[in-house]
């Protein structure tokens, strides 16, 4: 009985709901939401909703996701729903057993994806949330979950999510899969991928835009080891939070044998990483130089 269970039933999934009125958030379940009375407004038609999804051996109240939630709320009067599927992510298992549970956590990603699709449909039906105002941001296994949520939502024949942001999507047991078994550019109208590690993540292009931070691996300030790999993998979340928090734009240059310097960038061929990426005309793969310390800015204040 020592093997990690990493069991997940949908009833165990909870979430932290945060708004400008309640920035610290409250832990809730879908049952409590269905009974009503939690959202004090019944009409959320003008509210932006962001689903945030953690990765393997993590949880919704991990400081990196709390920081991103704060940054999102400072920038927009939105509602952040940080999904907590820690039981299924092996977070509660014995330290030494956590990693053995990874394949089970991978299986659980589909359950969580379906949960999010159902949840978003409920928000639209019961609270008048507009599909155009929904965005999913997932890290690691959470990015794969966001992709599965996008696929599940499309089964309702009600359209597609406008945007999914995959922060260093998990590579192991996904990277050689075809589109139906991993996050894919068809999961939303615009799929933005940030690559920061090539062992825990993948260098494979997956989205409408793929940003390769520092070539997509060995992030500055992280070291060459398993710890360094974890550090690089987590950097994706930190980079994105800084892109939300600061007007500083991390500029992506189209990938080529010798990418042009950021200083030569214009709006038409380069793209800023972040919530406004889809406003730029260019899609494809981009190289993003980064600094080793927050806000990781690469552009000396240049705006494009």
Swiss-Prot record:
Domain of life per record: Eukaryota
Name of one Pfam family that matches: Lipase
Disulfide bond listed as a keyword: yes
Class of this enzyme: hydrolase
Residue positions with a glycan: 61
Catalyzed chemical reaction(s): a 1,2-diacyl-sn-glycero-3-phosphocholine + H2O = a 2-acyl-sn-glycero-3-phosphocholine + a fatty acid + H(+)
Tissue expression per record: Expressed by the venom gland.
EC number annotated for this UniProt entry: 3.1.1.32
MF terms in GO: phospholipase A1 activity
Bridged cysteine pairs (disulfide): 6-90, 179-184, 222-231, 248-272, 249-297, 265-270
Location of the active site: 140 (nucleophile), 168 (charge relay system), 233 (charge relay system)
InterPro entries: AB_hydrolase_fold (IPR029058), Allerg_PlipaseA1 (IPR002334), Lipase (IPR013818), Lipase_N (IPR033906), TAG_lipase (IPR000734)
Assigned keywords, A-Z: Disulfide bond, Glycoprotein, Hydrolase, Secreted
Location within or outside the cell: Secreted
Entry keyword Secreted: yes
GO biological process, one term: lipid catabolic process
Family stated for the protein in its record: Belongs to the AB hydrolase superfamily. Lipase family.
PANTHER family: LIPASE (PTHR11610), LIPASE DOMAIN-CONTAINING PROTEIN-RELATED (PTHR11610:SF173)
Function: Catalyzes the hydrolysis of phosphatidylcholine with phospholipase A1 activity. May act as an allergen and induce hemolytic activity.
Name of this chain's protein: Phospholipase A1
Taxonomy of the source species: Eukaryota, Metazoa, Ecdysozoa, Arthropoda, Hexapoda
């Amino acid at each position: 009985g020592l093997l990690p269970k990493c069991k997940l039933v949908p009833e165990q999934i909870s979430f932290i709901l945060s708004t400008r009125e309640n920035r610290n958030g409250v832990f809730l379940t879908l049952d409590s939401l269905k009974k009503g009375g939690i959202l004090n407004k019944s009409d959320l038609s003008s509210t932006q909703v962001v689903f945030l999804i953690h990765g393997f051996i993590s949880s919704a109240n991990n400081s990196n996701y709390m920081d991103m939630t704060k940054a999102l709320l400072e920038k927009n009067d939105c509602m952040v729903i940080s999904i907590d599927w820690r039981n299924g992510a092996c977070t509660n298992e014995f330290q030494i057993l956590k990693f053995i549970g990874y394949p089970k956590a991978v299986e659980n990603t589909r359950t969580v994806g379906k949960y999010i699709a159902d949840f978003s449909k409920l928000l639209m039906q019961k609270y008048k949330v507009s599909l155009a105002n929904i965005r999913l941001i997932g890290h690691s296994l959470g990015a794969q979950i966001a992709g599965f949520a996008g696929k599940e939502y499309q089964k309702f024949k009600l359209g597609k999510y406008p945007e999914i942001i995959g922060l260093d999507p998990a590579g192991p047991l996904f990277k050689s899969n075809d589109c139906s078994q991993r996050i894919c550019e068809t999961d939303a109208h615009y799929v933005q991928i940030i690559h920061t590690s090539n062992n825990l993540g993948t260098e494979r292009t997956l989205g409408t835009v793929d940003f390769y931070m520092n070539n997509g691996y060995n992030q500055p300030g992280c070291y060459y080891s398993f710890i360094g790999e974890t550090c690089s993998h987590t950097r994706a979340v930190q980079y994105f939070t800084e892109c939300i928090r600061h007007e500083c734009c991390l500029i992506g240059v189209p990938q080529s044998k010798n990418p042009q310097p950021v200083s030569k960038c214009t709006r038409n061929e380069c793209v800023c990483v972040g919530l406004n990426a889809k406003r730029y005309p260019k899609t494809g793969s981009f190289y993003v130089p980064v600094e080793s310390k927050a806000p990781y800015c690469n552009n000396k204040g240049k705006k494009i």
